């Protein structure tokens, strides 16, 4: 810069002008040729810098289009779409929410808009659509949640009610079992002792065999007694009728019922059982026993009655046997070798 020239910028003024002070070479003061010049700012970048907007040195066509569109979107320069354009764009969005380049160009040509405007409208519309979709999904999920929560609360109430019922029933059952056990303990139950009805039935059953045996023996005795009476009542010349007590046959310590025949032979059980028993006549001198022919009548006090012809055969042996066993009969008092016989 040449000496004597000064440049002042008037940034505070809204016109953006500059002042030049030119001092002459020969001037020594203000009156010596100093001059002031006022002019506009020649640099475009400085004018834009006053607005605070920085423009890059190299720009692409897309960046220029975007800058122009956003400049149009400013509040003072925003262009509103007509209802016909909005309706056509909405219908196109319902058909397909994705915007292809060919479709974007065609829509811009039909609507008389810039392709960039159509693209931005579709982008904003998709965002609103997604927001609405999320809101609908949220409302649906919230309704489902509320329904499930109500069902859960109802199930909890039912669960508490059933639990209370179970507890009350359990308490009643325990009380019933306690009452039953108390009543059962009051009644004395001895497992080892039979019931009263069983005792009444069991006692006759225990005595029944003995009673039957006694009845059978009594019947047999009665039958043999009848047979003996029949035979005694129908005897021949030397026979006699004796009392009922004479029908008891005593031998070897055991009593037996025997039917006596009118002949010499008399009825006795097996010989093995009466091997110690003998038959023989007993007179008055020896045993104090008299026969029917001695006194003319039958005596019940004697032990044996023998005919004279049959008594001869056993006289000696019977008398000897009687004295031999007399002492033994007195000691035990049980064995008596006496027999009855009729002819």
UniProtKB/Swiss-Prot annotation:
Cross-referenced Pfam families: HALZ, Homeodomain
SMART domains per the UniProt record, alphabetical: HOX
One Gene Ontology molecular-function label: DNA-binding transcription factor activity, RNA polymerase II-specific
Chain residues forming the annotated DNA-binding region: 74-133
Domain of life according to the entry: Eukaryota
Keyword ATP-binding in annotation: no
Keywords, alphabetical: DNA-binding, Homeobox, Nucleus, Transcription, Transcription regulation
Region named Leucine-zipper: 132-176
One annotated Gene Ontology cellular component of this protein: nucleus
Entry comment describing in which tissues the protein is expressed: Expressed in seedlings, stems, leaf sheaths and blades and panicles.
Location(s) in or outside the cell: Nucleus
Region of interest called Disordered, as start-end residue ranges on this chain: 218-239
BP terms from Gene Ontology: positive regulation of DNA-templated transcription
Function: Probable transcription factor.
Family: Belongs to the HD-ZIP homeobox family. Class I subfamily.
Protein name stated in the entry: Homeobox-leucine zipper protein HOX16
Protein source organism: Oryza sativa subsp. japonica
């Amino acid at each position: 810069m040449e000496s004597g020239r000064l440049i002042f910028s008037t940034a505070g003024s809204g016109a953006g002008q500059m002042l030049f002070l030119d001092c002459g070479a020969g001037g020594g003061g203000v009156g010596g040729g100093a001059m002031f010049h006022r002019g506009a700012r020649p640099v475009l970048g400085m004018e834009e810098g006053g607005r605070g907007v920085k423009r890059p040195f190299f720009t692409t066509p897309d960046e220029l289009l975007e800058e122009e569109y956003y400049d149009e979107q400013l509040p003072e320069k925003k262009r509103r779409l007509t209802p016909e354009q909005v309706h056509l764009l909405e219908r196109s969005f319902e058909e397909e929410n994705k915007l292809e380049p060919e479709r974007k160009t065609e829509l811009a040509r039909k609507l008389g808009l810039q392709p960039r405007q159509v693209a931005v409208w579709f982008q904003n519309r998709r965002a609103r659509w997604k927001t609405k979709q999320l809101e609908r999904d949220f409302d649906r999920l919230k309704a489902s949640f509320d329904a499930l929560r109500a069902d859960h609360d109802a199930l909890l109430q039912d669960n508490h009610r059933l639990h209370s019922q179970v507890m009350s029933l359990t308490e009643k059952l325990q009380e019933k079992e306690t009452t039953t056990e108390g009543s059962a303990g009051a009644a004395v139950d001895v497992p080892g002792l039979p019931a009263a009805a069983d005792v009444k039935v069991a006692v006759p059953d225990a005595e029944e065999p003995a009673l039957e045996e006694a009845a059978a023996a009594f019947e047999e005795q009665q039958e043999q007694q009848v047979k003996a009476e029949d035979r005694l009542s129908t005897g021949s010349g030397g026979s006699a009728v004796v009392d009922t007590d004479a029908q008891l046959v005593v031998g070897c310590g055991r009593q037996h019922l025997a039917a006596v025949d009118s002949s010499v032979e008399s009825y006795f059980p097996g010989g093995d059982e009466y091997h110690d028993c003998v038959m023989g006549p007993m007179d008055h001198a020896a045993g104090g026993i008299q026969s029917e022919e001695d006194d003319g009548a039958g005596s019940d006090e004697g032990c044996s009655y023998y005919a004279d012809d049959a008594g001869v055969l056993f006289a000696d042996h019977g008398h000897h046997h009687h004295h031999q066993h007399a002492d033994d009969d007195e000691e035990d008092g049980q064995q008596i070798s006496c027999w009855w016989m009729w002819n």
